[in-house]
Amino acid sequence: MTPTTPADFVVAIPARYASTRLPGKPLQLIGDRPMIQHVAERALLAGAREVWVATDDARIVAAIEHLPGVHVAMTGTAHLSGTDRLAECARIAGWDDQACVVNLQGDEPFAPAAGIRAVADLLQRSGAQMATLAAPVDNAHDLFDPNVVKLVRTAGGDALYFSRAPIPWHRDSFASQHDSVPAEGQWLRHIGIYAYRAGFLQRFAAMPPGMLERTESLEQLRVMEAGYRIAVAVTPEPFPPGIDTADDLVRAQMRVASA
């Protein structure tokens, strides 16, 4: 078992301007600040040793380059995923292979600091190649929504599988109804925050996508199909949903306005 002292970690935030569902998403205002600034401030609040934003757009650079404690990596335009972009960011930043890198999505302006620290601590504590978080599914809509990724894990906390399907499948309950969460069993939804060592991040980005990833369109399945461990912990406090659509943005703006 690895040491239990709080992890020393860096945070890398992939930020892409050309979002399909919400163009210019990182620069959309929430209150008086762009979304990407909120995310970077959450990372700083969590106690990250360094915070980097990885982007290929000069408009995003201009919006955050003035922020104290936040670095910007101008990355290439051909990356197919956030993992590829973060791998380039890690090379630009010059992180040692053993550095703990937390991948915090650029559309998580309300990510709790405790959750960011928790995923870094989990990586250190578990000895797994990757770490991530989950939260209980408490409603049938999320359970059967393919946009809400579900997961199952071992008794020791390692991921067994991630899926857009409602796993585990409750043979008796699901055969007759899809409008409630069965009382027996536990269903978990994935929270898309990751931690890995910088060296493993490079290895991950270099792996070809496997059949499972191509089928489910879930990048983390590449790691599992290659035989590596992903440790999963239930988040220590609620993780508000990220922002994917214009409706999500309106709700976020209302949340800040009412605070």
Swiss-Prot record:
Q: Which GO terms describe its biological process?
A: CMP-keto-3-deoxy-D-manno-octulosonic acid biosynthetic process; lipopolysaccharide biosynthetic process
Its EC number is 2.7.7.38
Its GO CC terms?
A: cytosol
Which terms does the record give in the GO molecular function aspect? 3-deoxy-manno-octulosonate cytidylyltransferase activity
Sorted alphabetically, which InterPro entries does this protein's record hold? Answer: Cytidylyl_trans, KdsB, Nucleotide-diphossugar_trans
Q: Which reaction does it catalyse?
A: 3-deoxy-alpha-D-manno-oct-2-ulosonate + CTP = CMP-3-deoxy-beta-D-manno-octulosonate + diphosphate
Q: What is its main location?
A: cytoplasm
Q: Can the keyword Nuclease be found in this entry's annotation?
A: no
Q: What class of enzyme is it?
A: transferase
Assigned keywords, A-Z: Cytoplasm, Lipopolysaccharide biosynthesis, Nucleotidyltransferase, Transferase
- Pathway listed for it? Nucleotide-sugar biosynthesis; CMP-3-deoxy-D-manno-octulosonate biosynthesis; CMP-3-deoxy-D-manno-octulosonate from 3-deoxy-D-manno-octulosonate and CTP: step 1/1; Bacterial outer membrane biogenesis; lipopolysaccharide biosynthesis
The cellular location(s) given in this protein's UniProt record come to:
Cytoplasm
Q: Name one Pfam family in it.
A: CTP_transf_3
- Record family assignment: Belongs to the KdsB family.
Identify the NCBIfam families for this entry.
kdsB, PRK05450.1-5
Q: What does this protein do?
A: Activates KDO (a required 8-carbon sugar) for incorporation into bacterial lipopolysaccharide in Gram-negative bacteria.
Annotated protein name in UniProt: 3-deoxy-manno-octulosonate cytidylyltransferase
- Organism annotation: Xanthomonas axonopodis pv. citri (strain 306)
Print the organism lineage: Bacteria, Pseudomonadati, Pseudomonadota, Gammaproteobacteria, Lysobacterales
> Quick one: which gene encodes this?
kdsB
